[in-house]
UniProtKB/Swiss-Prot annotation:
Its EC number is 4.2.1.24. Pathway: Porphyrin-containing compound metabolism; protoporphyrin-IX biosynthesis; coproporphyrinogen-III from 5-aminolevulinate: step 1/4. It comes from the Bacteria. GO terms for cellular component: cytosol. GO terms for molecular function: porphobilinogen synthase activity; zinc ion binding. The lineage of its organism: Bacteria, Bacillati, Bacillota, Bacilli, Bacillales. This is Delta-aminolevulinic acid dehydratase. Belongs to the ALAD family. It comes from Staphylococcus aureus. 5-aminolevulinate 2 binds at S274, Y313.
Length: 323
């Protein structure tokens, strides 16, 4: 009987390493940090074990730890002292993220700062834009100028990449126009253009204090049941000038990561979101899984699906890679 002997290429660890198709590197990782304006706070987020809200005055130690591990890309999320109905704190000169960015750039010039460009952390209603008084929904076109102001303010503070996440129609085009007019034509846009209205975001909203005070975000984030819609969003953002595309969430949407990869030649970013991280942590803390092996399998699955970069809360990946 003749048959194929596939096991020949699995015969030893060295052989398996040699023929491995996908690899996870420290250079692939973008690490989120939650920054609060209050002093002397380092508070573990209950629903995100191992992740902390950190004060501006304590930020340097967190940045040093991440940098020493080999992380070279950071994404800041702000928890401001005060909020209003239009998210003013997102774009003021001394906003919490602007201050954090200046601290990071002063410490490490080669640390890439990816700026999450949204309003939800700064609005008193928790939505991602200006609320229309009549429809009680986010007003798409009135929100766009505020996003542009936020992006420019973030770049002025030292951000290297703008990552708009509020899923307004036309947000890439308007931000690109605004950056170019301000002379920042070399700043790339990493669009959250394929972002689903997912239940996996829950722990993040605890961490960033950004849960909507009414309703939900289903009128601007995508339906988890839809696949072709992701390609329409991708096509629009590419036309508008995005340089990289985020798929969020990642693990339950690996088919979408592959679709996006197959339909574009720009880098694809998988966001390993808070709920995915927390489920893994909970299972590991109960002794049900081997955390290191499961995390690395998750990472390589995202790379295999087509992700060029991964946004992850798990900085321990760097330690795993060192081992």
């Amino acid at each position: 009987m003749k048959f194929d002997r596939h096991r020949r290429l699995r015969s030893s660890a060295t052989m398996r390493d040699m023929v491995r198709e996908n690899h996870v590197r420290k250079e692939d990782l973008i690490y989120p940090i939650f920054v609060v304006e209050k002093d002397d706070v380092k508070k573990e987020i209950k629903s995100l074990p191992g992740v902390y809200q950190i004060s501006l005055n304590l930020l340097e130690s967190e940045l040093k730890e991440a940098y020493d591990l080999g992380i070279r890309a950071i994404m800041f999320f702000g928890v401001p002292n005060s909020k209003d109905d239009i998210g003013t704190g997102a774009y003021i000169h001394d906003g919490v993220i602007q201050q954090a960015t200046r601290i990071a750039k002063k410490m490490y010039d080669d640390l890439l700062i990816v700026a999450d460009t949204c309003l939800c952390e700064y609005t008193d209603h928790g939505h991602c834009g200006v609320i229309d008084d009549h429809t009680h929904d986010v007003d798409n076109d009135k929100s766009l100028p505020l996003l542009v102001k936020t992006a420019i303010s973030q770049v002025e503070a030292g951000a290297d990449i703008i990552a708009p996440s509020n899923m307004m129609d036309g947000f890439v085009a308007e931000i690109r126009r605004g950056l170019d007019e301000a002379g920042y034509y070399n700043i790339p846009i990493m669009s959250y253009g394929v972002k689903y209205a997912s239940s996996f975001f829950g722990p993040f909203r605890d961490a960033a204090d950004s849960a909507p005070s009414f309703g939900d975000r289903k009128t601007y984030q995508m339906d988890p049941a839809n696949r072709l819609e992701a390609l329409r969003e991708l096509e629009s953002d590419l036309k508008e000038g995005c340089d990289m595309m985020i798929v969020k969430p990642a693990l339950s949407y690996l088919d979408i990561v592959r679709d996006v990869k197959n339909h574009t030649n720009v880098p694809v970013v998988a966001y390993n979101v808070s709920g995915e991280y927390s489920m893994t942590k909970a299972a590991a803390q109960n002794g049900w899984i081997d955390e290191e092996r499961v995390v690395m399998e998750q990472m390589v699955s995202m790379k295999r699906a087509g992700a060029d970069m991964i946004i992850t809360y798990c900085k321990d990946i760097c330690r795993y890679l060192d081992n």
